[in-house]
Amino acid sequence: MQLHGRQAGEIGEQVFGCAGNKKQNKHQQIQPPAAFDKFQRIDFFPGNKSFHHFDPQQLHKEEDPLYGGYRGGPAYYIHDLVEDHLKKKKRYVLPAVLFAIAGLICWCGISQVISNSVASSFKNAFSIPPLYTSIMLVILSAIIVLRKNATVKVLDFIVPVMAVCYFFITLFIIAVNLRQIPSVFARIFEEAFGLRQMAAGGFGAVLMNGVKRGLFSNEAGSGSAPCAAAAAECDRPAKAGLVQALGVFVDTIVICSCTAMIMLLAPKDLINGLSGMDLLQTAMQYHLGKFGVIFIALTLFLFSFSTFLGILFYARSNVAYLFGDKWCFQTAYKVLALVMLFIGGIAAYTFVWDLGDVGIGLMTIFNIIALYPLAGEALSELKSYEESKKS
């Protein structure tokens, strides 16, 4: 059940990640087609990283005395890796501590992205001030945290239904605008590799933004997903790894492509200068009228709860690694996440993304370094699993 809740939470992050692919400042403008090209190129080959994630966390997890079941993640397999190298037991190891701290920073940033996106969408759809939306989100999220089990069961049903609806609405939009598809792909490659962009340094900016949003959306390599996946009970670690590798493809290539096509099929002049939920909802209003704006607002509202539950689940094992098995520290981080949820709803759009980008960037650096020595374990488990399937 916990793994299902995490996977449901990822759906919301796909929409947030792709809708954030347009960013402006006074020096440069990064267009959605160009960023989407780099976004998909970076995200086309991340499944192997996800598989290598899930094998180590299944092999290096431990029992959770607070919540029951198991816990793990990069902080734990990094710790075991350093201990094996030093050949002595230690309470903390610096790389694992740095990963845990970076993770907690990142998930606070994601809390802000959630509320910022929902507040913006509710303002566009219902003219509700962001302050009121932020207060409502904090109150409802606090109730979810206190009654998590019942709520996760509801979300396990609601979120997949909303994701399917989102997918089929996108197919409808594509079918209606089928003649524009060739020109959309022409724009993608033209704005990604055009001489003007390369001469102005825009190529590097587009690549950087596509990488950041791609990493944010599917998390492959960052080390966040294994924090929750360690709780999964399976007879072979390879099964969890293969499922996650497929999940990365579905999450990114399917869900994020849906969001991108909605935006790119809208007239360029209509969405020029917009970003985030303003960009996505303006495009939806062009395609489906007021219904499209309201649908995105309600969809993101439901996705936000699953995403918030997911990041709190990610944080459990890292808080326990840093501060031990004490409920007071678990509760303190939940309160901090709720505070960041409130701040994000009324903060500037670029600020909330920057905090999440810093955290997830640091997480990825520490985690990727640790994955290389552990790759042998993952490959050995995969070969063993394949041989068992043949016999």
PLM features: what roles do these ranges have?
Residues 329-383, 390-391:
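A generic transmembrane alpha-helix motif of multi-pass inner-membrane proteins
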Residues 95, 103, 116-122, 126-176, ...:
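Membrane-interface loop-to-helix entry segments
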Residues 106-119, 141-154, 172-183, 261-295, ...:
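Transmembrane helix-loop junctions in multi-pass membrane proteins
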Residues 58-70, 79-116, 120-144, 298-309, ...:
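Helix-loop-helix module between adjacent transmembrane segments
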Residues 80, 85-97, 234-249, 325-334:
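Membrane-interface alpha-helices at helix entry/exit sites of multi-pass transporters
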Residues 133-148, 159-179, 212-213, 238-265, ...:
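Selective recognition of specific alpha-helical transmembrane segments in multi-pass small-molecule
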Residues 56-59, 171-187, 201, 231-234, ...:
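Extracellular/periplasmic helix-exit of transmembrane alpha-helices
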Residues 1-20, 27-55:
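Short, strongly patterned local motifs
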